[in-house]
């Protein structure tokens, strides 16, 4: 298949837009309105002054199988770093962490599930009965503060409905893949039931042997998946003018981790395969009162217990045996209290408080003996005040301004003797100008400031001068245009952006001893300056009631403006995990008699694996297919993941790991091979 180069994306999209605008006839069905809920004021996607993507339930069912990982390629300028069994670390517009081993957990991409903050631990994103996925690109400093320097991923589970619901879903596939799920719901009984009181529950078990064969142990399940999901959500009216929404989740992902091989194949030789287990629990309570003022309170707890272990030598050579294990407990408790004016909602004001507690226990073994051990405790308390004011300048023009100020106090201690208590005051906000012409469409120009707290590097080998790093500030200028035409079944949007990074935080690593694969010093440093700029476009067209075409495209440049770590000059080089181009194309066909088919193509250009070396991935295109038959009561579909059977690198490390000479070499984690399966769903009521 020919590869579409980034330089050709704008021409392709311009041709599509011109052909659609001049040659399509009216569509039979009006478009369903998509509402973005993650911002301070909910608004339709086509009237939201930010580059955003919303994936609805139909897209999640059609393009996905089990996890959010299946649909990430549909979002422009979104990437993720592997090295885990499921995506945990994300990058938006080239900004975001690739791991989190030690020190301060300061994620750049916010990750919320029904208001529960799983930023930095975003694995429990199973797809069954998920309502909507929203991705807001660019700094969201007014909304979420330091956790949204690069943007925000917001997941909403399906809302409860009073109508009775009982649905079973079963999946079987290659690699011993099997899943069974139940979705149930209906009207709430008792004093809080009322006309609109309702509940909804999801239970699912998913298992797979994975796509690796361990030659040393003669097993095919060392990189397998074993995931259990339990979600419950209820909505009711506790009093007059009050509404309440309670959401809780329990997700256990007891997965194997045996993904790397010395020859970069899918045949591993580790004698002590790793493990990637995350037990996620969360609870959120949203209260809202509508009157002259709208009062909204969101109280949430998100808890993640993680066991992450791997075979450090990736082999079974006698006398050369390294293993590493991390125990990580992460909890975020947050309270958001917000007031906004009723009606047009021309102002919003709020207070936010949170506490993040994290405990890490690292144990490295050499030949079965303790080689390195570190236990640390981290606590961060944040208090913030924020507000937004918007005003109509004329029937076509509107201006808005937002501001957030937060105070952040951190306490850290570990068994190496480190004890730190930094305190910071941080701020962010945005200025936005909106334009609505008479002939339709929506344009905006925004200037936003995002921020990310400073932190520290730990360990006895860290040089004193690099033990502490500063807070990062980011300024973003964005110009966008959105258009929706119900008559033609068309929505389109395009945004261009330029972001300036000051005291840019850069994650890097150094291998102290070439003969020790676990002797990495993981640290965060401040680059003097950096820039991230590019273009994002999305198009959805329904030329007939049976056919929907969708596509996205993204261009990105992310050069370091001035960065000279140690004896290297990275000025002008792109940042890690920031592909210069991405695109996706989806074709969804649904016949009137129940037959359906869907094709998804996703492409990403090459990117650097790390800021500590210059090794890169290769450009990669993947395809997914689904076809089947559906009725109002049941559906059956055959699906094919990675239909082209492409081998793509998700993560790469460059170091010495092969005795006796330990030459530096690139080791990569490959994508899963082609996999076929069958999913059947029955709606019993």
Language-model segments: which ranges?
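Acidic, small-polar-rich N-terminal luminal/periplasmic segments of exported/outer-membrane proteins
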Residues: 29-163, 479
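Gram-negative outer-membrane beta-barrel transporters
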Residues: 348, 392, 396-399, 407, ...
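C-terminal beta-signal and adjacent terminal beta-strands/loops
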Residues: 4, 603-607, 629-685
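Face-selective signature of the C-terminal outer-membrane beta-barrel domain
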Residues: 237, 242-251, 278-310, 321-424, ...
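Membrane-embedded beta-barrel scaffold of Gram-negative outer-membrane proteins
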Residues: 286-313, 436, 442-448, 470-542, ...
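C-terminal beta-barrel architecture of Gram-negative outer-membrane proteins
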Residues: 185, 462, 560, 577-630, ...
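Outer-membrane beta-barrel translocator/receptor signature
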Residues: 105-108, 128-137, 142-214, 221-230, ...
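Periplasmic-side early beta-strands and strand-to-turn transitions of outer-membrane beta-barrels
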Residues: 161-163, 171, 182-276, 304-319, ...
